[in-house]
Amino acid sequence: MPNLHDIERRIKSVTSTKQITRTMEMVAAAKIRRASERVESALPWAVAISDMLISTAKYAHLDNEPLLQVHDEVKRVLIVAVTSDRGLAGGFNTNVLRYVEKLSKEKQREGAEVEVAACGKKAIGYFTYRGIEPVFSFAGYSADPEFAQAAELSGYVMQAYAEGKLDEVFIVYNHAKNAAEQTLVEQQVLPVKEESYADLLGLKAKEEDIFKSFRE
């Protein structure tokens, strides 16, 4: 049976752990708040730009645009996995990585060669442990992403697709509805599909012809 000294030491240990946990919660709450503010400030721009592109694309002559062409045969597929850099996030990263593995196996069964791009330390560690070498790896940017990394990856993707080296490109990530709820998203990036972006951003096809007044 523990003596009084052991009990006191145990109480101090539990109290110390509680204080550390509370501090971690406060730090996490502050980070979530800042991230939410950045997302909320950027979303109107994303919606407006996507809405404009969707509305105008059907009036442009894009029949020969390489990024809109559906390839006759799907031989090579790229899947971009987006995770966090740190753990202690429940199923946040696990759900993404398991889905990427599931999607990869589906495409392989269909006869396609699959390569992956890993965004986040958790994705990099997951693929490295399984002997999979990502074509691109980015770490340390989940809290404060930069345009340079996105431009590098998108440049590779667009060039490879236009040259016929890639036939389909998907991105898998978690869409955070709030701090407690995330929705797993699989989005086809290439070939470009209007519905993919419209559904994602909550855009609806407009009944009216926004260019009608200009043509009359």
Predicted stretch roles:
Residues 1-216:
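C-terminal beta-strand-loop-alpha-helix "lid" module of Rossmann-like NAD(P)-dependent dehydrogenases
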